[in-house]
């Protein structure tokens, strides 16, 4: 018979100082299974699985827990067995959520000593499946705000039950839908967290700039009479190069990044073809498509490489398009649901501030999915509401990252240690004037810091930048206050670099649970961006694709390579 132990009994059993031996903690982990936590009167919590995981070469031992909060809020949690740093971390999800992917969310954090939790937000689905919304008001409530809060409270109860004491500090860290979760927590449940990192928060549409729209509309205006795209992937490289040539130095630094796209006066008509040779220019129809992407869609100057696989469909796949996730309720024409349950648009954070909590709000300038204007406008509105920029910066700061795509990726320095920044601010009072990040080498895993280091100074109104250079591990650091060094690239043929980029894009997409189509788009994007970084012309592109080592590539990666070969064969 399943044992049911209520929280008071568990606390009585597990009270006291941390055990001297990991074996005792492993036994405590197993004892959690089958328990029930009365953490909230209206949110009973049940632990369905708890098992100690032994230490390995990659991490120390930890307790893996699975449970749910009534009615359907599933969560996964990792608790370090003998190396807890005293902190509790909740990770958010992406898109439509629907999966408590605890290893993906918490694996690296438990290695650093965090007790870490993630929830599925109350439903089963893929990242882009919104069918769960139909006739599911409770599901919308959970997705909107309840699930994050009740599972956060449950996680704190588990920390106390397992370690015999409450966490010293509690943090939230996530992007996109997860960024929305973070803002909702600051607005609705200001005492849940001491520090929140909210990156590219979704569903801030009511604050302006970009209205939700179906991607099929983009597909429609980019489809010609022959059912092929008017603006193919390869033209994104041409447009991006023109934007960089014109606007790179607007911030005083030649680094291939657009520091503030609002100051870039590039117009697509500048690339209008003057002859019948259209390979290095834009036709009138292509100019019209680019204009719509900048104005109707709201894409920023400098984001062009991130259109590949997102706005621009492959020439060999008529009628198919990768669909980013948009605001669920707005897309269904229900603004009441959006305002009350989904949109994190309340600028009044007095309770969060008075709890002495801190907020890092982050947005990539080249984000293809969550456009920068709503994030900027939300912060500016918050600053006005909270007594002005100076008063707001005491507890909440906005960081705009040049060249960064949605959550990460792109050409900017998107590999950033956000947890070091937020814990330093919360626990030591070191408000981060800068975020330090790197742009990994093509094909490198996300935790490889092997390229020039960018120091990004973010002021809420100006988004100014300073830089210094770091040439990579084992290399001599060269300080350049007004610029950065040329990235250190591996000495290998372009085909080998492409193989690495394809393999890494495939790995990341598969690990994140993306659909086949999304993984395919990610691989194509990696190929084109590698071409751009290498400055490869048409002949070099064809040769590089032909030289890709196909041994060991997955079926989806092979399909991407075949499609790229077909596209490069077109005029």
Task: List the model feature ranges, each with a label.
Residues 165-176:
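Alpha/beta-hydrolase fold nucleophile elbow
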Residues 294, 298-460, 467, 491-498:
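C-terminal subdomain of alpha/beta-hydrolase-fold enzymes, centered on the catalytic histidine
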Residues 75-78, 100-105, 127-131, 183-188, ...:
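Short, solvent-exposed loop/turn and secondary-structure capping segments
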Residues 175-184:
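Glycine-rich nucleophile elbow surrounding the catalytic serine of serine-hydrolase chemistry
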Residues 95-164, 210-211, 322-341, 400-405:
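Cap/lid segment of the alpha/beta-hydrolase catalytic domain
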Residues 22-87, 91, 100-105, 240, ...:
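Catalytic-loop region of hydrolases
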């Amino acid at each position: 018979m399943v044992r049911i132990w209520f929280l008071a009994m568990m606390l009585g059993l597990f009270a006291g100082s941390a055990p001297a031996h990991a074996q005792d903690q492993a036994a405590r982990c197993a004892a959690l299974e089958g328990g029930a936590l009365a953490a909230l009167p209206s949110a009973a919590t049940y632990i369905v699985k708890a098992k100690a995981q032994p230490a390995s070469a990659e991490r120390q031992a930890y307790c893996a827990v699975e449970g749910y909060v009534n009615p359907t809020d599933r969560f996964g949690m990792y608790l370090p067995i003998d190396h807890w740093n005293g902190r509790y971390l909740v990770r958010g999800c992406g898109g439509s959520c629907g999966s408590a992917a605890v290893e993906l969310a918490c694996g690296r954090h438990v290695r650093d000593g965090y007790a870490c939790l993630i929830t599925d937000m109350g439903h089963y689905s893929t990242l882009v499946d919104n069918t769960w919304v139909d006739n599911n008001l409770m599901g919308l409530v959970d997705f909107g705000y309840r699930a994050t809060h009740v599972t956060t409270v449950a996680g704190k109860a588990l920390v106390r039950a397992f370690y015999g004491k409450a966490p010293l500090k509690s943090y939230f860290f996530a992007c996109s839908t997860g960024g929305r979760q973070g803002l909702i927590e600051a607005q609705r449940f200001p005492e849940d967290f001491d520090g929140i990192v909210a990156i590219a928060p979704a569903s801030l549409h009511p604050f302006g700039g970009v209205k939700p729209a179906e991607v099929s509309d983009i597909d429609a205006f980019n489809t010609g009479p022959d059912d092929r795209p008017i603006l193919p992937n390869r033209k994104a490289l041409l447009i991006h190069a023109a934007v960089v040539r014109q606007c790179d130095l607007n911030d005083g630094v030649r680094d291939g990044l657009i520091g503030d796209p609002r100051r870039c006066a590039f117009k697509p008509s500048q690339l209008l073809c003057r002859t019948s040779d259209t390979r290095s220019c834009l036709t009138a129809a292509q100019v019209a498509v680019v204009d719509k992407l900048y104005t109707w869609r709201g894409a920023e100057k400098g984001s062009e490489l991130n259109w590949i696989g997102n706005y621009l469909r492959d020439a060999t796949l008529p009628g198919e398009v990768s669909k980013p996730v948009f605001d669920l309720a707005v897309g269904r024409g229900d603004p009441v649901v959006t305002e009350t349950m989904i949109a994190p648009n309340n600028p009044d954070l007095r309770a969060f501030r008075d709890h002495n909590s801190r907020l890092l709000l982050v947005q990539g300038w080249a984000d293809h999915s969550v456009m920068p204007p709503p994030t900027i406008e939300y912060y500016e509105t918050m600053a006005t509401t909270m007594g002005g920029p100076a008063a707001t910066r005491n507890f909440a700061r906005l960081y705009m990252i040049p060249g960064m795509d949605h959550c990460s990726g792109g050409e900017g320095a998107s590999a950033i240690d956000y947890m070091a920044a937020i814990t330093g601010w919360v626990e030591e009072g070191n408000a981060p004037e800068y975020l330090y990040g790197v742009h990994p080498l093509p094909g490198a895993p996300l935790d490889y810091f092997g390229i020039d280091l960018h120091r990004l100074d973010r002021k809420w109104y100006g988004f100014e930048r300073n830089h210094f250079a770091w040439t990579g591990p084992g290399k001599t650091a060269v300080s350049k206050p007004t610029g950065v060094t040329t990235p250190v690239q591996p000495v290998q043929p372009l085909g080998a670099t492409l193989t690495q980029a394809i393999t890494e894009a495939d790995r990341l997409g598969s690990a994140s649970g993306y659909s086949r189509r999304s993984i395919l788009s990610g691989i194509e994007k990696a190929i084109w961006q590698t071409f751009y970084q290498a400055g490869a012309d048409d002949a070099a592109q064809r040769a590089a694709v032909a030289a890709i080592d196909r041994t060991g590539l997955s079926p989806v990666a092979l399909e991407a390579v075949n499609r790229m070969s077909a596209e490069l064969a077109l005029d």
